[in-house]
């Protein structure tokens, strides 16, 4: 028998009425739910046991059959099948609707699918469906022709009759000798009357001719026409009419008609025909029928999915769906009754409209008109509301499940723990591991059965704790700190049982979790299965997660006290006890320190292991003892940055276990010496520099001059403002320099800031110098500086100005965190199916990585190429020696060699150019930065990329808070810029760019400012003459197109005429150059573009400049869509990567280019079809680039005409919604729209991404290579590194 879960794709499509009836176990005919006295479901009601199954396991409604032995029997008395009660979660019912009803998803969507198919506007459709207008459903052409003929006969008959009547009257008048005037008047009246009669008949004929299927008629028009021409046409209203029209559609004919229309029309009409064609193709390819968008049978959800529960006061709480179903059933029953008794048409029509509205409310309440409310103001939750939004079924229950075997507690620091350990409170561990402890108690014979084992555990006997110790030995636990921004926010640890109620966390993993000990809480999860335990131990243990996946930097680097302790340990103190003493080796120096003869930081001389005399300190000797032998003696002050570099270097030469031991030793050293340093901070440590008074007075003077010039009208408001800001910024910098110059290098404040433990020079300047300029809530700098320092105290006015900045910091924190989280969610969605699925895609393409022109704006070339694979040989520019072969990894040594060779650009493999049709290949991605090796197969690199970009987004957001609102770059400018780029939106301040290469001319006149770009491209056309041909033109001669340039030379004196088609003729007009047998015509083509420049924009070019296409003409940011249309795909990819990188790098956040490239690849993965050729593709359709190439290749192989298309740059939201997986798209945004489209197209989800597998409860298709499998590779690397030169010989970026 096939397993229920054994499937590899899910299809969604429209349900036919027959299919709905086949799902159903019976028709629900009554609106009742349960009997309020017996509390039993009413028969044929919404909770009927006969339809949906018994309420109690294996017990029918009347109680005749009880127990499992009657399973499957249907009670002859109450009609209930004997089964488990859980069938009430699966069994559906149905309602037979008295008249067809439109499904609101298909009638009211944008665009309305029914409207598009029938060529009706949404407004017209609404008029029909809600019974306000009639629509013609059929026209009898024969009857129409006959009616027209009859009308013409009647018309001529009437005219003839009237004519003879007039003739008789005229004859009579002539006999009575009437005046000529009177007779003429009668004739004139007849002429007018005849014209009126003909006009009336023509009007009726025109009305008949205008009757077309699908035309709308008002009620008056309908009755008027029906009275006269009842046999010519049929018209009706409501969903019934739409059902008829939809069932008449012949999809093949419609397709041919629309294809013709897309080829023969243009503009809006072509666009609409393209959309209609896509819809027709969708119905043709899927097995759906268009009439299924109109419902004649309504499915009823199983009752346990819309439960009704009794509350304490005898009242009932019920799902809103029951109320919505009740309304539908009531109206349906009433309509059936009215139709049976033959009620007037108007009453029936009104009841049909009410039924349509009831079904609309059930499916999607509030989409049309006023939403139905239950219990006063509470809006009823419809079926669509159950799916959409954060509380909907997708995001609340399918993607965010609750987890058992988990706990939560406050965290405290555990300085004595090993790196791979965490402290788990005994009581918590006992609850978490209860089943394991109970099993062990029974197995070891300490309890006879599980029940008594549970009692032992609940009484917490001493033997229970002994067994608990054994259980936790081989079971790691997962710790998670919310918000889970990247994969390092969940790590595995070996639990150590402790007393108390708080979790203990190793201090070195705090930065990975972004945790501190001010009341943070963390969750604990227990991996249950063997596979889960194996994965936790081999890939999730904290010792396997020491590097940041975003940049490859160490994440387990010491901080705060530990940094200060190591810095204090390695600094020198001039004049300290024992200074200048000489020792034979390190051990002797340490013994003297332990005996108290020399000071820890005294400068001494010692012979190292190689016999060289070193000038160092005992502290540095102690510090170097914990480092591996392969690392050269570190004879310098060790601040935070140096520790990071040392850890990065050691990671490459030590195993995970040795690395963990070394880190624990550094941690212990740091804590020990931070304690013995006796560091403290007092008011006396902060001294205001003497130069401050003079500098502030000079700045006041310059400010007064600027104010005076402004008062006299010599400068503008902007110039005054800029002058004041510049003055105070300069002054602030000078005061900062003065503070630095006057620092006590042995002082606590200086050491704290210099070591990188806490604080920076900006904060010290605010304490000792002056607070400086502040920003107001809008981000504008206030031109009134705070001249006091925090040491001196602020005046009342200064205090209130400073609160501006502080408040802005707090407000930004609250507002921007959500923005960053939403950006992360969109990034995750767009990349969730990017997984490493191929070893090598074999592409020869790549991307150029170029040394940035502006240092500090982008990372240096050496950092950007590290860990990438080359797409071309990297050759030394001077010697020609190959530094890196094609298709080889650039490691640290090769990267250093490239830097030293002065190479400024390298062609590397990139995710942007990877040709894997699904996911990505290992070579194009390169090194996994978190593991420092080539990325493993099945790694979810898309998720890693999204986390790497999103996690620092939140960090940047929160960073405003820590600077206390002092003037500086605020993420308010950074995060929206990143969002703008990833959403491919036009920038707020959009720069004008040139569409062509050419020479600039800036024009300024009364009509404003214009820039004209003129391009004169010189081309040449060459003609090679066979020998013996004679030229008919001279060099430098101007020739016109079509002029003869050369002809065959005739032999002898023959008079034969040369045929004109034998001559060489000029294809273009231009100037001739003749060189031997080669004639060249030089000609130029000129092109001009003119751009109007808005007054507020600053021009970046000047007259006479030569510029390239895509170059900026004005200030601002370039619209990525413009770059795509002018310079193409590669240029826009490069622009996106560099612009995003600039935002992060300027904030001091390091993200590897490849993460941004993964996102950019997803933004450009679709193409829009321009012409379909001989393929089944539809013009205007969005198709995956690789699928498009595949289809074209097949068509070309068969000798057909391929389709044409252009690349589309989509924002991450649009890209997520147009993903191949409808499950992933529906769980992201616009759930109902995605499901509507997917159902019509009959989409198949192949379950290739992560989200769709999580939704249906399968394992995700991403398994990393376990660390055990990687140990052999690592051992080889460590052996190679051990024989490598010592630390000083390695490049800076590998430290």
UniProtKB/Swiss-Prot annotation:
Zn(2+) 2 binds at residues 841, 914, 921, 924. One of its GO terms (biological process) is DNA-templated transcription. InterPro entries: DNA-dir_RpoC_beta_prime (IPR045867), DNA-dir_RpoC_beta_prime_bact (IPR012754), RNA_pol_asu (IPR000722), RNA_pol_N (IPR006592), RNA_pol_Rpb1_1 (IPR007080), RNA_pol_Rpb1_3 (IPR007066), RNA_pol_Rpb1_3_sf (IPR042102), RNA_pol_Rpb1_4 (IPR007083). Its cofactor is Mg(2+); Zn(2+). Keywords: DNA-directed RNA polymerase, Magnesium, Metal-binding, Nucleotidyltransferase, Transcription, Transferase, Zinc. Belongs to the RNA polymerase beta' chain family. This is DNA-directed RNA polymerase subunit beta'. It comes from Dehalococcoides mccartyi (strain ATCC BAA-2100 / JCM 16839 / KCTC 5957 / BAV1). The lineage of its organism: Bacteria, Bacillati, Chloroflexota, Dehalococcoidia, Dehalococcoidales. The gene is rpoC.
